[in-house]
Amino acid sequence: MTDVWRLAIFVLMVNVLNDQVSCSGPPGPVGYPGVPGVPGPRGPPGQPGAAGRPGDPGPKGPSVKCPCRERSAFTVKFSGRLPPPSEPVVFTEVLYNTQRDLKESTGVFNCVEPGNYHFSFDVELYHCKVKIGLMKNHIQVMEKHQLSKNEYENASGAMIMPLRQGDKVWLEADVETEEPDQAKVVIYFSGFLISS
């Protein structure tokens, strides 16, 4: 009899436990948000973005008129009869002298705009001996010699010199020959302002 009761109580307990496990009530209300976690580590760099579109054109700048003037320059040529010695060579042909800083009647360059000038000369001679000098304010600053007998010869020189307003520059040529009828001399003389 005791065993029967024990079995009945055991079966009853099992049924009660099964009812408790299989039965659940309705869902409860949503809980409060939890505390935020700590920030995670920095991620790797992303890929470069696409190029942006070109910006709008800027406003047009102001127009400025350059106050520049033409720089002093000349090129002249001498040919024909032999020039007199120890005097400025008076040139027979003007190739360029727009600013008229070289006085064509005297062959003398007069500095109007102070600055650094480049002067050069080239002499072609035949059957004669030539000494040519570059002069500045009656002082010789360069001298070249050349001798020609039975063929054409050349002599040339160039120099950069600073000039002040009113300074004067010219060429002088001393020509010696035993055959004046055959002797020939052609001289080119150039100068121009490099910087002021």
UniProtKB/Swiss-Prot annotation:
Ranges annotated as biased composition (Pro residues): 28-47
Keyword hit for Signal? yes
**Signal peptide annotation:** 1-23
Q: Do you know which PROSITE patterns this protein is assigned to?
A: C1Q
The membrane spanning regions, by residue number, are: none
Main location group: secreted
Q: Which domain of life is it from?
A: Eukaryota
Region Disordered, residue ranges: 28-64
Record-annotated Collagen-like domain positions: 25-63
Annotated C1q domain ranges read 67-196
Mind telling me which SMART domains this protein's record contains? C1Q
Q: Name one GO biological process term.
A: hibernation
Which sequence ranges form a coiled-coil region, renumbered to this chain?
Answer: none
Which terms in the GO cellular component ontology are assigned? collagen trimer; extracellular region
Task performed by this protein: Plasma proteins HP-20, HP-25, HP-27 and HP-55 form a 140 kDa complex via disulfide bonds in the plasma and are hibernation specific.
Under what name is this protein listed? Hibernation-associated plasma protein HP-20
